[in-house]
Amino acid sequence: LGPDGKRGRQTYTRYQTLELEKEFHFNRYLTRRRAVEIAHALCLTERQIKIWFQNRRMKWKKEHKDESQAPTAVPEDAVPSVSTAADKADEEEEEEEEEEEEEEE
């Protein structure tokens, strides 16, 4: 901990970064079980994995910001996706945590 009570910035090895990026390529969101597996495999904490993914999603969002503003054609026979209240709660919790992490940096 530094004089301000915050932890220092985590640096990841090339191997850890490569593995995290590889996982992110296939899934932008992790299940808790998968986060535990990755944390164990990379000798990191679940919290470090969670925060890395939150930060990486924000980076991805910024990189793809322009793409999402372009009008997209939706086929007339497209079926709207169905999300449960639990999914919505999880998404809101993730967004709140991302905002908290950004404030900490």
Curated annotation (Swiss-Prot):
TM ranges: none
Primary residence: nucleus
Compositional bias segments (type: Acidic residues): 89-105
Recorded GO MF terms: DNA binding; DNA-binding transcription activator activity, RNA polymerase II-specific; DNA-binding transcription factor activity; DNA-binding transcription factor binding; RNA polymerase II cis-regulatory region sequence-specific DNA binding; sequence-specific DNA binding; sequence-specific double-stranded DNA binding
Keyword check for Transcription: yes
Any coiled-coil regions, as ranges: none
One Pfam family matching this protein: Homeodomain
Keyword Transcription: yes
Annotated compartments: Nucleus
Family as reported in the entry's similarity comment: Belongs to the Antp homeobox family.
Protein name: Homeobox protein Hox-A7
Species whose genome carries this gene: Rattus norvegicus
